[in-house]
Amino acid sequence: MAAKPVAERARRLVVLVSGSGTNLQALLDEIAATGTEAYGAEVVAVGADREGVEGLARAERAGLPTFVCKVRDHPTREEWDAALAEAVAAYEPDLVVSAGFMKIVGKEFLARFGGRFVNTHPALLPSFPGAHGVRDALAYGAKVTGCTVHFVDDGVDTGPIIAQGVVEVRDEDDESALHERIKEVERKLLVEVVGRLARNGYRIEGRKVVIQ
């Protein structure tokens, strides 16, 4: 088996969460098991849009810096977006990872981190974008669905696709059961993709993402 490429230095990751942080934990576990150098990246900070979420607690248990940037603490959504961008930029990340971050970022954030902000979605984009991807796939009668790892742009789940994982839809599935199986695939795919982006580098050609 060929050895994994090793990045010249570990890429700096800022991870954004809104809830339980299971994708964050998957990243932390893989980096701990593999080693920062071999994985190619390290988490340098974790941010959230609300206090008291388990994702922040996971970060604190790992000894990582955390920050909270709440929408309601700012007069406008634009000012919140600028404040979030400033908070993230303070840690000088190479990549920003949305690990269940449920807020849509705006122009200021994308001006700084466009092409470097990685998100996951529980459907095979461009099918079933938006907040109810799992429910919509079931309602449509899709026989397969899955998850997408993509870069964030100024649309809703419209950014360039990096990788996808397929999950079969079973006849007995309800939204919860299907979503749990998607999340299992999503966690593994996100960990794999972030590591490859960090170790190998990448380029974006229109809508196509090429990992070197």
Task: Describe the residue ranges of each PLM region.
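N-terminal Rossmann-like dinucleotide-binding module
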Residues: 2-54
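An anion-binding loop in the catalytic cleft
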Residues: 2-14, 35, 68, 184-212
